[in-house]
Regions:
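N-terminal alpha-helical scaffold/docking segments in eukaryotic complex subunits
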Residues: 1-32, 136-150
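Amphipathic alpha-helical scaffolding segments comprising HEAT/armadillo-like alpha-solenoid repeats
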Residues: 1-9, 32-43, 69-82, 106-120, ...
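Short inter-helical turns and helix N-cap capping residues of alpha-solenoid HEAT/ARM repeat scaffolds
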Residues: 12-14, 48-50, 86-88, 124-125, ...
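Hydrophobic core positions within HEAT/HEAT-like alpha-solenoid repeats
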Residues: 20-22, 38, 56-59, 95-96, ...
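Helix-adjacent hinge/juxtasegments
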Residues: 48-88
Length: 150
């Protein structure tokens, strides 16, 4: 079963792999049914294909709310490295996913915000850098507002 899950998420047919990831993400908003595969999703963060990394970021973020075992503690550092992923689209996806992680795991908010502050975005083209900075500002605003309301 879990081999099938990873195979479906890494399939050559990006359309079906994306649809499968969307199903997992959507269902994970309502149920912890996919959390048992958390450790199987983690290696996908380092997949050579950025589309697979994007899927893994969102799936893990969607399952952060079910993480009573604190497995996220073991992966937060690796997750945060994708703020400056080699692919700017993946960096943007990571930054957006971190809003969900921070809302589910408020103890990470200071680390997330600190990672934003010290992220070196100089490797990105001038056309992408402002978009990444805007994503950081939006996620920062979400997390700071959450911190104020709690």
């Amino acid at each position: 079963m879990k081999e099938d899950i990873v195979a479906n998420l890494t399939a050559k047919d990006d359309k079906s792999a994306c649809a499968f990831a969307e199903k997992i993400i959507s269902e994970s908003k309502e149920t912890d049914k996919w959390y048992k595969y958390f450790d199987d999703f983690v290696p996908l963060l380092n997949h050579p294909k950025s589309l697979v990394r994007n899927r893994a970021l969102y799936i893990l973020a969607a399952n952060a709310q079910w993480d009573k075992e604190n497995r996220f503690d073991d992966i937060i550092d690796g997750f945060l490295t994708h703020i400056t992923d080699e692919k700017p689209i993946t960096a943007r996806q990571c930054i957006k996913a971190l809003a969900q992680v921070g809302l589910a795991k408020p103890q990470y908010i200071p680390r997330i915000l600190s990672s934003f502050k010290y992220a070196d975005l100089s490797k990105y083209k001038d056309s992408m850098r402002p978009l990444i900075e805007k994503d950081m500002e939006e996620t920062e605003k979400i997390l700071q507002n959450f911190g104020l309301s709690n």
